[in-house]
């Protein structure tokens, strides 16, 4: 079980210059983990584990102790993809802002 704080997202944002100045811009993040499972036929089947998107705005990140949520990633010593996206109103779609592999111990 890990806890993600909004100040951690701010730290990533400052380091990687992903958040824009528009404080009302909507962002979302999630963890994603693809794994492979052996089927009866001996073939590999890809099983995808991911956690639902958690949405937030920059306004909400001003309180560093405001929790985004507790996330149970189930598997220790595994690498998950941590992704942040922002919503572009003009294009009416979510666009990538940041992605990185996170090792969970």
Across the structure, where does each feature detected by a protein language model lie?
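Contiguous beta-strand segments within globular domains
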Residues: 1-24
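Short, aromatic- and glycine-rich surface loops/edge beta-strands on solvent-exposed regions
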Residues: 27-30, 71-90
